[in-house]
């Protein structure tokens, strides 16, 4: 079996409907997977039922059977029974906290390694990396560890933009990621702009979408990654 994981920067790009831009990216992962489990734990400011309803509506044209993990009495069994795994955006710290709380980290990692398709956007992409140390989110709750699913062996930074508001004196995103690379100079960070995604298929990794990504690693800072780039070397 081969890993088949799609890591989306965001649920929207511009003013497009929820998950609409992601449909062409997600569709290839659904050809042999109809029964999907959605993990809404990153959704702190909405009910899990409402979050699930938004995802079901957003992906309606794919005709998938999507249930929320919160609807199942045994979250671990729900993961075991699923053909595919969806993890949505929101607060990455809360998401990871709940994954640890329900003992899902190793189980999801093993399922994905065995070939179960994985789709994560925003926080759901963050937790697919080595750790959540490069998330943009507020640490509203403390998970037992920052270590994440390790579906890819590097760091991710979704929603990437290095825009600086005129007159604003806070650090840019690039400056924040530089801080990480000073502490962990050997760990790559891929910063993904909205509208783009990383697709891992076994030992291959490619950048999809309409906007470039950026690599931060050691002395390499904000190195442009064009759309369509083969990034398979980062999996080694």
From Swiss-Prot:
**Top-level taxonomic group:** Bacteria
What are the annotated GO cellular component locations? cytoplasm
What are its GO biological-process terms? proteolysis
**Top-level class of the enzyme under EC nomenclature:** hydrolase
Q: Tell me its EC number(s), please.
A: 3.4.13.21
- Catalytic residues at 122 (charge relay system), 137 (charge relay system), 159 (charge relay system)
Q: Where in the cell is it found?
A: Cytoplasm
Which keywords describe this protein according to UniProt? Cytoplasm, Dipeptidase, Hydrolase, Protease, Serine protease
InterPro entries in the cross-refs: Class_I_gatase-like, Peptidase_S51, Peptidase_S51_dipeptidase-E
Question: Catalytic activity, per the record?
Answer: Dipeptidase E catalyzes the hydrolysis of dipeptides Asp-|-Xaa. It does not act on peptides with N-terminal Glu, Asn or Gln, nor does it cleave isoaspartyl peptides
Can you provide one Gene Ontology molecular function annotated for this UniProt record?
Answer: serine-type peptidase activity
Entry's family note: Belongs to the peptidase S51 family.
Q: Provide the function of this protein.
A: Hydrolyzes dipeptides containing N-terminal aspartate residues. May play a role in allowing the cell to use peptide aspartate to spare carbon otherwise required for the synthesis of the aspartate family of amino acids.
This protein is called Peptidase E
């Amino acid at each position: 079996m081969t890993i088949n994981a799609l890591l989306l920067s965001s649920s929207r790009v511009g003013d497009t409907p929820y998950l609409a831009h992601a449909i062409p990216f997600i569709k290839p992962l659904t050809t042999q997977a109809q029964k999907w489990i959605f993990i809404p734990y990153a959704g702190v400011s909405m009910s899990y039922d409402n979050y699930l309803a938004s995802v079901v509506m957003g992906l309606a044209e794919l005709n998938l059977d999507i249930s929320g993990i919160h609807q199942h009495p045994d979250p671990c069994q729900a993961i075991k029974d699923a053909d595919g795994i969806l993890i949505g955006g929101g607060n990455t710290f809360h998401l990871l906290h709940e994954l640890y709380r329900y003992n899902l980290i190793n189980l999801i990692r093993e399922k994905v390694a065995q070939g179960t398709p994985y789709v994560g956007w925003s926080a759901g992409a963050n937790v697919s990396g080595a750790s959540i140390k490069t998330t943009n989110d507020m640490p509203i709750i403390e998970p037992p560890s920052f270590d994440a699913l390790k579906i890819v062996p590097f760091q991710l930074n979704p929603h990437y933009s290095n825009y600086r508001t005129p007159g604003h004196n806070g650090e840019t995103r690039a400056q924040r990621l530089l801080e990480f690379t000073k502490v962990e100079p050997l760990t790559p960070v891929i910063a993904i702009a909205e509208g783009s995604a990383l697709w891992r298929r076994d030992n291959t990794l490619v950048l999809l979408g309409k906007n470039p990504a950026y690599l931060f690693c050691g002395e390499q800072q904000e190195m442009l990654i064009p759309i369509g780039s083969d990034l398979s070397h980062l999996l080694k």
